Amino acid sequence: MKKFTIYLAGDSTVQSYKTPVKPITGWGQMLHTYFKETEQKMNQDGCDWMGYGKKSDSDFDQSIIYETDGMFIDNRAMAGRSSRSYFDEGRLDDLKKAIKSGDYLFMQFAHNDANKEKEERYVTPEQYEEYLLRYINAAKERDAQPVLVTAIAMRDCDDTPDGKFSVSFPEYRDKMLEIGDKYDIPVIDLGKATDDYLNTVGDEGSKKLFMWLEKGAYEGYPDGKQDNAHLQQAGAKAFAGLLAGLIRSYDRDDKLDKVKAELA
């Protein structure tokens, strides 16, 4: 049977990373590890910093494709992109050239959409719907299945009165849930799942998931780092696992059944 492809569109929290930025890792870089895998060929041209995947046929160099037993995961997410700037740069047009009948388009945006200081990225929640519909319609026009993924939670416990984590970009999450209901599109509420998970691991535990790095621990970050938005490998692995679990438990309809069947 011909393999289908899951395409990922999103931002830095989804992106696959190459050297020398280790250990920053997007959840899209680890998602393949939760599916039935064929034996991986390592260190192919364009692979990620762990040696997995290879350059996809995208016109954009950061895109990396992973092969599993029954499908491909083509990660076309890119740091700093919102639903607006991703579209404006022609990245959706590039994706449209590849996506075909039976494929999936998973999209996670909000981190950059909510940034009012970056005019080229910012969209209001109402505009967010307009842009997401462009992705949804692009998939549907090619008989592919669009899937909405709410944005992962940030490490915001230092900024809340009770030291608890909260759902990030709630207006955009609410709008995405509304879009899912309105247009009958599957929604994977990764934002809520990651918020719940972070409240379980707590303040100190969350530092091992995000880019909190000691000085000298990594060549690319000699001065260390305290980054509450981006994930290191352990965080990307955990969050990808939450996404896989949400796919497995999805029961609103049968639109994700083909993906479920490939989970390990």
Model-derived regions, located:
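Alpha-helix initiation/capping motif
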Residues: 2-5, 26, 82, 170-171, ...
